[in-house]
Amino acid sequence: MKKETFKEQVIEKITFPVPETVKTPWFAHRGSIPATLEYDDCTMYEKVEAIARKYPGNIAFDFMGKHTTYKQMLDQINKCARSLKTIGIREGDKITIALPNCPQAIYMLYATNAIGAIANMIHPLSAEKEIELYLQMSESVVVVTLDQFYNKFEAIRENTKIVNIIIARIKDELSKPIKTGYMLTEGRKITPIPKDAPVIQWDQFSKLGKACSWNYKVKRKSQDPAVILYSGGTTGKTKGIVLSNINFNALSQQVIAANPMFRPGDKM
């Protein structure tokens, strides 16, 4: 595998001015918060990559007491991206991510974005029929989920276009003391997946990227589709909501603009 080389990334800006014909009485109550912003005209992956290059040693997230820096996070994202390309994922393909708030969910979300695929985000506790509907609506070709949810996906697999099921495990991302406690409590309740099950275990999946010697990153636009989320279905059948790169990136910039006291390294 070729060693990656990086050059300083220049991200263009994009604005969405408020038309003069639109009445905005609430602007008078915003204080010092700007009414409009200059948004980064890039993908979700490019935004995270730029931050990781700028603050490599800063803590990106804390999971059950285990710290991960931006550099470590970006390394894992790129590793996943190469592995996705190795198993044949192409630009525009849908990848269903059915994970709780865990490190693998972060890695897979941004890896999916890096290669130009679309992340279909669903709740892992959804019922089988709901999962089947989400997979059919999105036409997903890959599912990433935890070991304890495997049986639900295998039960409806033949009714979908799923080619690969990638299995992650919570225990793999825990520190040693926490892992020991987890395996003595929640971990022991998980039904083992049969050794001959048609799945790709996370550790095996991570190693597949070593075979990727070509450019795995795909250049996309800020307003291209990036993520699919689902409505609650309170007024009818649940619907897939397609969000763009800039939908996510804008939210992060709006949070910072609304909280000017935030500084690199602060926790939220």
Regions found by a protein language model. Name each.
Residues 24-35:
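Short, contiguous pre-domain boundary segments
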Residues 84-90, 209-224, 228-268:
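Conserved adenylate-forming
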Residues 124-159, 251-268:
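Conserved ATP-dependent adenylate/AMP-binding module captured primarily in the ANL superfamily
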Residues 155-222:
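ANL superfamily adenylate-forming
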